[in-house]
Amino acid sequence: MRIIAGKFKSRAVKAPKKSAPIRPTADKVKGALFNMLEPVEGCSVADFYAGTGNLGIEAISRGAAEVVFVEKAPESLKLMDENLRGLGMDPGRPGGGIRIIPIEVAKAFYLLHQEGKKFDILLADPPYETGVLKRLQNLLVQYPILKEGGIFAVEHSRKDTELEAAFPYPMVRQKKYGDTLLTLFKNG
């Protein structure tokens, strides 16, 4: 895996071993996602199911002002920390614009809402399993942490048909890459 664009362009990002249950976003899909999201510069971004930090690091490289990573798996957190530090970033430094929340996604939504946080971009690359997208929909309704005009971008399986018309925001774009769909929703 590598960083596609920005100040860290072409730098390598550590990936999990092939046997690990982590499915990082492929470079081609990541590039397409960020082309759909442009511009990212100056935005506040939350990366849910962050894994190794691949998407959030791409956002940092492209000039995001703040990135919050949400991931609970210890192996992923270790790789994320190594990836950030390998690029000269200290995720533990206060005021550094980088925060790692090492808890389950639903608890992170609650925490961020309680803190009054609102983001320009929400990224989600959940496991390809039944029920996850519906849970994300419910969390977005219960804890509205996406700014007016903000984008919620989710990577999911083409087989996952849970994205309903009742989703809290209208779908603005969708692209297919093999078994993967990138779907973008806009708040307002």
State what each model feature region is.
Residues 1-188:
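Class I S-adenosyl-L-methionine-dependent methyltransferase catalytic core
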